[in-house]
């Protein structure tokens, strides 16, 4: 970590929160580039795999777990940049989620983003986080971003400082 040497070439869906962190820390240009990379991971198979070897551009963990991180980063970048491409990114991701994960009774994980084979499970964070970030991305006036902070489960807490 302190040498700057690359120790791996895997990027996963759980790492996709980091563009938002970079943007909130003021490094918007790096955040933009990393979000573009995360979105390329999404578009490679039409939905985000759990992990990808970005050197080989091959999926190393093919499941899709309905995670919020990439949508959260799009929302944060949309706020800080007002660039409409993040809303468009969100529209594509939402459309893909509905297309591939919708069931008669809700949504489900995918066993494989390559084959689009559906699982039989819906994580609670789909409702608590993923869909909430989509809503906020598409309707930013619903919440004053600068007057709240989000806890780890995407619950907005009013800032008093």
Regions found by a protein language model. Give the residues of each.
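Glycan-recognition and catalytic cores of secretory/periplasmic carbohydrate-active enzymes
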Residues: 1-161
């Amino acid at each position: 970590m302190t040498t700057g040497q690359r120790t791996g070439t895997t990027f996963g869906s759980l790492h996709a929160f980091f563009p938002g962190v970079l943007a909130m820390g003021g490094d918007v240009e790096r955040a933009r580039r990393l979000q573009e990379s995360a979105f390329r991971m999404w578009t490679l198979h039409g939905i985000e795999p759990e992990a990808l070897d970005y050197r080989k551009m091959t999926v190393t963990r093919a499941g899709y777990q309905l995670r919020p991180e990439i949508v959260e980063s799009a929302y944060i970048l949309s706020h800080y940049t007002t660039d409409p491409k993040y809303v468009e990114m969100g529209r594509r991701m939402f459309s893909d989620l509905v297309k591939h994960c919708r069931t008669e009774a809700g949504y489900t994980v995918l066993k494989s983003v390559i084959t689009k084979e559906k699982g039989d499970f819906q994580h609670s964070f789909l409702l608590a986080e993923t869909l909430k970030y989509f809503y906020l991305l598409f309707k930013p006036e619903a919440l004053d971003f600068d007057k709240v902070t989000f806890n780890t489960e995407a619950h907005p807490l009013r800032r008093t400082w």
